[in-house]
UniProtKB/Swiss-Prot annotation:
One of the components of the core complex of photosystem II (PSII), required for its stability and/or assembly. PSII is a light-driven water:plastoquinone oxidoreductase that uses light energy to abstract electrons from H(2)O, generating O(2) and a proton gradient subsequently used for ATP formation. It consists of a core antenna complex that captures photons, and an electron transfer chain that converts photonic excitation into a charge separation. GO terms for cellular component: chloroplast thylakoid membrane; photosystem II. It comes from the Eukaryota. The modification Phosphothreonine is found at T3, T5. Belongs to the PsbH family. This is Photosystem II reaction center protein H. One of its GO terms (biological process) is protein stabilization. InterPro entries: PSII_PsbH, PSII_PsbH_sf.
Length: 73
């Protein structure tokens, strides 16, 4: 016969670690959504500032903005 049965007593459960015990409270809120907008406006502000930063970097790269004393190849 090609199949083999294994006793449940020989299997061990998941191993507990210190890191796992520290991170478990973070996972306890999984799937729960706070009512309302929450931190959405803050994320919008952060994304806007990051987009402005990327535009400035792009303009410097394209030499649209010239910086005194800095030459680009």
């Amino acid at each position: 016969m090609a199949t083999q049965t294994v006793d449940d007593s020989s299997k061990s459960g998941p191993r507990r670690t210190v890191v796992g015990d520290l991170l478990k409270p973070l996972n306890s809120e999984y799937g729960k959504v706070a009512p309302g907008w929450g931190t959405t406006p803050l994320m919008g502000v952060a994304m806007s500032l990051f987009a402005i930063f990327l535009c400035i970097i792009l303009e410097i790269y394209n030499s649209s903005i010239l910086l005194d004393g800095i030459s680009s190849n």
